[in-house]
Regions:
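N-terminal targeting signals for export/organelle localization
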Residues: 1-48
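Structural microenvironment flanking redox-active thiols in thiol-disulfide oxidoreductases
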Residues: 81-118, 128-135
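Conserved N-terminal glycine/acidic-rich loop preference
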Residues: 63-66, 110, 120
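Short extracytoplasmic
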Residues: 40-67
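Thiol/disulfide oxidoreductase modules built on the thioredoxin-like
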Residues: 115-120, 127-174
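Short active-site neighborhood of thiol/selenol oxidoreductases, capturing the structured segment around
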Residues: 57-80, 86
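A generic structural signal for alpha->beta connector loops
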Residues: 44, 95, 121-122
Length: 174
């Protein structure tokens, strides 16, 4: 009976260790949770242009186009870190439509940010109330999505993109 009492916690601990090792070897990144939107249709949205409130962009405007969607804000420091990379993407993939959604930001602050740092986007939409981000399941800024020509979300990245992430994860899909 004494042996059983001593061995039981050891067996439980060993079992927990085995499950932890199996999980760690499964190559799942806990910082990169799967998106429920992957391989789903692009959510329906309509957004006014940051620069011309009479111009509107809609989900239907992207039929047969590859689209990179980036949610950003002028007050978002990680957004500023990844910002220059969108210029490179724009130059390297001229057929790629890069849509920036300015999220819960002051319009004048957003315009100043893009005037100072440059505008790499094909179109900048306004998401002042956060409803478009909600449709995309945006958790925090920045977040980036890649949509294929069939209108399906094929890639999502939470956080600032880096050269390595673009080269290893995004480029193969472009």
């Amino acid at each position: 009976m004494k042996k059983f009492i001593i061995l039981t916690p050891l067996i439980v601990l060993l079992t927990i260790c085995v499950f932890c090792i199996i999980y760690l070897l499964s190559n799942k990144d806990p910082l990169k949770p799967p998106s429920a939107l992957l391989n789903k249709d692009l959510p329906l949205f309509e957004s006014k242009s940051l620069y011309d409130l009479d111009k509107v962009i809609k989900t239907n405007d992207f039929k047969n186009k590859k689209v990179l969607i980036n949610f950003f804000a002028s007050w978002c420091l990680p957004c500023k870190v990844e910002h220059p990379l969108f210029f490179t993407l724009s130059e390297d993939h001229q057929d790629l439509f890069i849509l920036g959604f300015n999220h819960k930001d002051n319009i004048e602050d957003a315009k100043k940010y893009l005037a100072d740092d440059g505008n790499p986007y094909s179109f900048v939409g306004i998401d002042s109330d956060g409803m478009i981000a909600l449709e995309f399941g945006v958790f925090g800024l920045p977040e980036t999505f890649l949509i294929n020509e069939d209108g399906k979300i094929i890639y999502k990245f939470m956080g600032p993109l880096t050269k390595e992430i673009i080269e290893n994860e995004l480029e193969p899909l472009l």
